[in-house]
Structures are given as structure tokens and as C-alpha cells.
């Protein structure tokens, strides 16, 4: 909720915390070990899907002790003419040449599967040596496209979540945990 009160705490807008800050930090260490093992002695291009994955990627790559290059891609989701289906569109492209590289795409959440399916489809045409995906959150119950991530931080219920990079109307990304936004705030009046 928009609030110019200096005593406002955005955690007050959270109905329920589903992944604590401590759980995130512990899982980052384990996820880093999994990725290090998978890419041992290989040069990896890590591609972050931003804005949502920016905090996750920043924290995760500090757990990696592999040879890596980092690039970012920005995706926006737009609705078809019938206003029912989101179509991912690349807003900012990567600069790395992926040909012959091992590629790891990192995103904040896998829910419908549309974004990661779209991005991996595009990247496959760039002839990488291998292509894997990593997500902080896997929300299986809403999957509309058959897609599985190779590395998963947490599997979560079908709830609208914010925090640790995930937003609602560009808010709540700064929260150190992941929580469910209070129901009355999920359809607020227009924020300025």
C-alpha cells in the first residue's frame, strides 16, 4: 500500500510469511552447492531475468565458485487481444554470445511456465552447449505450460507472493522474506 508515513513498515502488508529470510539464506547455500557441482570446471553464462530475479541472482552468484559470465534479460508480460493470456516479450536483450556456452537462466518464480518456456526457446536457437534453468520459487499448481526448472529454491502453494525481489505494482521487492500480500491489498485503488 502506498504510505508516506515514515513509521510505515511494508511487512505490515503481509498476511502470512511463507519463506523466512533465514530459510532463504540457508537454501541459497545449498542451491549454490548444487549449481557448483553441476557446472564444475565449466564456463557458464548466467542469465538473470530481471527485475524479479535481481535480488535472488545477486545473492546466489556469491555462492558460486565456478567460472561464469553474467548478463540480464528484461521480460514484460502482455495480454493477447482477448485479454486472457499473457505473452512474454523481451524488452532488453542479452549481450553475450551464447554459442557453445553452458547457459543457466535464473528467474524469480515459475508459475505458468510461459516466461521460461519462451526464453529457453529463444536461447536454444543461439546454440548453447547446454541450457538449464534455476528458479527461487516453483508454484506448480498454476502451470499452463509443461515446464520444469532444473534447480528450485522452494516449492510453494498457489498464493500471490511478494518480497525478496517479487513485487506487486513494483512494490515489496525489498522485503527480506517471501509472503502473501493481504487480500484487501491485492486489488487496491490506483496507486500513484
What is the meaning of each model-derived region?
Residues 1-192:
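PRPP-associated nucleotide enzymes
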Amino acid at each position: 500500500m502506498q504510505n508516506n508515513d515514515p513509521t510505515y513498515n511494508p511487512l505490515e502488508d503481509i498476511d502470512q510469511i511463507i519463506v523466512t529470510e533465514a530459510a532463504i539464506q540457508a537454501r541459497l547455500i545449498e542451491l549454490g552447492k548444487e549449481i557448483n557441482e553441476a557446472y564444475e570446471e565449466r564456463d557458464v553464462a548466467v542469465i538473470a531475468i530481471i527485475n524479479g530475479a535481481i535480488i535472488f541472482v545477486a545473492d546466489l552468484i556469491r555462492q558460486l565458485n565456478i567460472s561464469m559470465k553474467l548478463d540480464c534479460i528484461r521480460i514484460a508480460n502482455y495480454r493477447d487481444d482477448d485479454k486472457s493470456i499473457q505473452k512474454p516479450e523481451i524488452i532488453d536483450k542479452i549481450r553475450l554470445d551464447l554459442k557453445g556456452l553452458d547457459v543457466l537462466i535464473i528467474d524469480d518464480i515459475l508459475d505458468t511456465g510461459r516466461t521460461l518456456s519462451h526464453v529457453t526457446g529463444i536461447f536454444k536457437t543461439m546454440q548453447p552447449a547446454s541450457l538449464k534453468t534455476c528458479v527461487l520459487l516453483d508454484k506448480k499448481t498454476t502451470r499452463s505450460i509443461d515446464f520444469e526448472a532444473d534447480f528450485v529454491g522452494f516449492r510453494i502453494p498457489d498464493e500471490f507472493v511478494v518480497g525478496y525481489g517479487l513485487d506487486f505494482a513494483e512494490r515489496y521487492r525489498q522485503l527480506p522474506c517471501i509472503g502473501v500480500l493481504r487480500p484487501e491489498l491485492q486489488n487496491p485503488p490506483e496507486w500513484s
